[in-house]
Amino acid sequence: MEGETLSDNLFLISVKLVNKDNQAFSQSYYMTGLEPTALSDVQRTFEAPEYETTVGIDLTKLDAAQIAAQIAQAKTMLPEGHSFKSVGSYQIEEDVPAGNSVFNRNKTFGKQHTSFVVRFTEDGKETESSAGKTSYIYYEAEVTVEPDGTLSIEEN
């Protein structure tokens, strides 16, 4: 996640983990030198992973060059007359069981999903001033990385 909107500077990395006792936790790491947050329990209503069946993200398969190529491709998918400004977040998630079975519909446990949010502006309309204040006007789109590596984009 970026720190300041439209800065394109990595600020925060959040991870979730599950231990052998099937307890799920989350923790955040700041790129500014701040100490990581304390481990906190994951809300089991929505995520109740089981250690034995959780695939997990293979960190050896994270490829910075591939991620950069995905971002470069997403830039070409923006509407004409708009300019890329930043990546708001980049997520790799795995479908895990929920504590409430209602939230398990349409899930394939172990299946991983990659997506990221791009932020962009309309050329010539990046700011708006009113009552002496200037606001930045930007749009967001979610980019989904399909299993075969192709990208699809949907404006939020």
Label each residue range with its predicted role.
Residues 58-63, 79, 97-104, 121-122, ...:
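Serine/threonine-rich low-complexity intrinsically disordered regions
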Residues 1-28, 94-137:
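Exposed beta-strand-loop-beta-strand "reactive/processing" segments of non-cytosolic proteins
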Residues 2-4, 8, 35, 47-52, ...:
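Glutamate identity and glutamate-enriched acidic tracts
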Residues 1, 6-12, 64, 68, ...:
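A broad structural signal for short, well-ordered beta-strand segments within beta-sheet-rich domains
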Residues 6, 10-12, 17, 31-34, ...:
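Generic detector of leucine side chains in alpha-helical contexts
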Residues 36-91:
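Long, charged/polar, surface-exposed segments that mediate recognition or autoinhibition
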Residues 23-48, 124-156:
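A short, surface-exposed beta-strand/turn
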